[in-house]
Amino acid sequence: MNLTTLYPFLEERKLRKRVGRGSASGLGCTSGKGNKGQNARSGGGVRPGFEGGQMPLQRRLPKHGFKNAFFKVEYAIFNLDWLTTFFKGKNEILLEDIYSHKLCSVGTPVKILGSGSISNIVTIEAHKFSRSALKKLHEVGGQAKIIEK
């Protein structure tokens, strides 16, 4: 006996509904779809959200807010302590290093946050820094190089 010979008992298996196979089956003739109408047709039924011609909910509710999606900038976010442990022994962390290690895709702007603590003097290159990250870098004598896009 092995895994390929295992099968459930016949009583436990739910049999599929065989429709349109004679009136004695209980699902013959109209195959459980009733008489005529949109739902009786092949591919019949209404799309999700259709309310029978009534103004649907998503159109009754007003538009809200402003979405500036075209100009939205998504930053790749890294914490100071994580970056310094990842690049242990380096005293300069450049954007090329972050991109070459595939920590984020090339061209994605990078923001450094100030979570955790750092002990070694390090120079970090990024597009943005949080106030806490700048404060912690300057406390240990490190530098933050802000890159203009």
From Swiss-Prot:
Keywords: Ribonucleoprotein, Ribosomal protein, RNA-binding, rRNA-binding
CC terms in the record's Gene Ontology section: cytosolic large ribosomal subunit
Region Disordered, residue ranges: 21-54
Annotated family: Belongs to the universal ribosomal protein uL15 family.
NCBIfam families registered for this protein in UniProt: rplO_bact (TIGR01071)
The protein's assembly and partners: Part of the 50S ribosomal subunit.
The protein's name in its UniProt record: Large ribosomal subunit protein uL15
Species whose genome carries this gene: Lawsonia intracellularis (strain PHE/MN1-00)
